[in-house]
Amino acid sequence: MRPQALALTATFLAGLTIHAAQKPFSSRPDLAAPDALSRFTVDGSGSWAVQDRMLILEKAGTPGGPIRRPSALAVLQSGPLVRATVQVEMRSTAPEDVKNRDLEIIFGYESPTRFYYVHLAGITDANHNGIFVVDNKDRRRIDDGTAPPQLKDREWHSVRLERDGTTGRIEVFVDGAAQPALRATDTTIGAGRVGLGSFDDTGEFRSLSVSGYPK
């Protein structure tokens, strides 16, 4: 075989290898299935259930332990994703008088002490309504902290997270907006699983879909 043909063949095979390594991941958990909850790893002290095609955080977790982090997570069982898009509808069921209500999307989950989370809340302050990383110590905010509150009521909200672990880009879109409500850039954790949760409140999630590329 001629050298040029060999080079072209090598390039073609390398392309196939890269494409195979980047085979996309896609999951839309059937929340109507009797065993739907088994698709998730429960982390923390909250109580979860599946009913009426919803993943329900029935009982809020209680923050505690050696580091400050969300107290109730349900992490989808999958391999680690380098790039991920998470779409979900969520509704807070915290009492009306709870102004700092929150619900979360988890991503880059490696372990109970190492993950990212998007914290959508009814107020914005140092600890609410932002993007945070837990890296074997108390959670740390990584966005600029200027976004207006995104979860001020008990209505359904559509949320989309886009995350690229190679560049560190993190963007969160709420209720179909063209511009992200929250954004950050961080590469502390390159890849991990995704999930849902709350720091210390209750809520409901439905129409969950996850797509992306594995590590």
Language model features: what each stretch is:
Residues A21-S45:
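Extracellular carbohydrate-recognition regions
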Residues A49-A72, G130:
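Short carbohydrate-recognition loop motifs
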Residues P66-V133:
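Secretory/extracellular carbohydrate-interaction modules
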Residues A72-G79, D144-L151, G195:
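Beta-strand-rich interaction surfaces with strong enrichment in secreted/lumenal proteins
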Residues N136-S158:
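Short, aromatic/His-centered strand-loop micro-motif at the edge of beta-sheets
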Residues E155-G165, I170-V172:
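Short tryptophan-centered beta-strand motifs in secreted/extracellular beta-sheet-rich domains
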Residues F173-R193:
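Short, solvent-exposed beta-strand-to-loop segments that form ligand-recognition rims
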Residues D186-K215:
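Ligand-recognition surfaces built from glycine- and aromatic
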